Amino acid sequence: MIVVSGSQSQNLAFKVAKLLNTKLTRVEYKRFPDNEIYVRIVDEINDDEAVIINTQKNQNDAIVETILLCDALRDEGVKKITLVAPYLAYARQDKKFNPGEAISIRALAKIYSNIVDKLITINPHETHIKDFFTIPFIYGDAVPKLAEYVKDKLNDPIVLAPDKGALEFAKTASKILNAEYDYLEKTRLSPTEIQIAPKTLDAKDRDVFIVDDIISTGGTMATAVKLLKEQGAKKIIAACVHPVLIGDALNKLYSAGVEEVVGTDTYLSEVSKVSVAEVIVDLL
């Protein structure tokens, strides 16, 4: 098995190759003057199985690059390709929200199913998207890695999900932290006032670990942090698998009172402090 890196996951691919005790295949990436993407497999390929690791932070570039890498590898005699897309782009457009919309991940699933033999990702936003694929679709969970990272940073914490849909993440983290877990519930007090508080637990005088699969604009989590602080919470650490963090998301979170924001290297950002390399190796 050879490990091939896309341009957006070079460090992560190196970590995976090292754990697998194999050399990272040399790939050249560049752009033509008109901005079209160029890839070239530089090393000689003497294996019929390849793993491409290419996260999809710059979504459209990553998708085209992956298609080109697959084509180049097939030409070099590779028979089986596993695509590891730690952050799988377009996964949130998993249904029609308005008439006439494309179901983006379904369209891409058809492409992936024709060019690779297996797809691996980490914490997809909705797991039912596996049904769009006609190849094995495997997903791993990086929440335990996030929980391990904060284990010595919090004192007798409670673990909170930002909503009921993320409760499973809180439950997973709570087992590692040996802590109680809950989710934040919104209660409308009036037409203009909403209260956000843990469903059953009391955050007063407690350290808090809030965990979700993705932080995008940071607005919802920042509001929750601010209200938890007002309710007497002590240290608050916010964590997510995919730190998309659009615009001033980090500023919102720190201004609201977060002590630290933690993410993984599925989506490289300044808070990507936890690697999913071991999770990927376990899935391979």
Swiss-Prot record:
Optimum temperature is 85 degrees Celsius. 70% of maximal activity at 72 and 95 degrees Celsius. Pfam families: Pribosyltran, Pribosyltran_N. It comes from the Archaea. Mg(2+) 1 binds at H125. GO terms for cellular component: cytoplasm; ribose phosphate diphosphokinase complex. Mg(2+) 2 binds at D163. Activated by inorganic phosphate, with a maximal activity at 190 mM. Above this concentration inorganic phosphate progressively inhibits the kinase. Completely inhibited by ADP, and partially inhibited by alpha,beta-methylene ATP (mATP). Lack of allosteric regulation. Keywords: ATP-binding, Cytoplasm, Kinase, Magnesium, Manganese, Metal-binding, Nucleotide biosynthesis, Nucleotide-binding, Transferase. ATP binds at D34, N35, E36, R92, Q93. GO terms for biological process: 5-phosphoribose 1-diphosphate biosynthetic process; purine nucleotide biosynthetic process. InterPro entries: Pribosyltran_N (IPR029099), PRibTrfase_dom (IPR000836), PRTase-like (IPR029057), Rib-P_diPkinase (IPR005946), Rib-P_diPkinase_arc (IPR037514). It is found in: Cytoplasm. The active site is at K186. SMART domains: Pribosyltran_N (SM01400). D-ribose 5-phosphate binds at R188, D212, S216, T217, G218, G219, T220. Disulfide bonds: none annotated. Belongs to the ribose-phosphate pyrophosphokinase family. Class III (archaeal) subfamily. This is Ribose-phosphate pyrophosphokinase. The gene is prs.
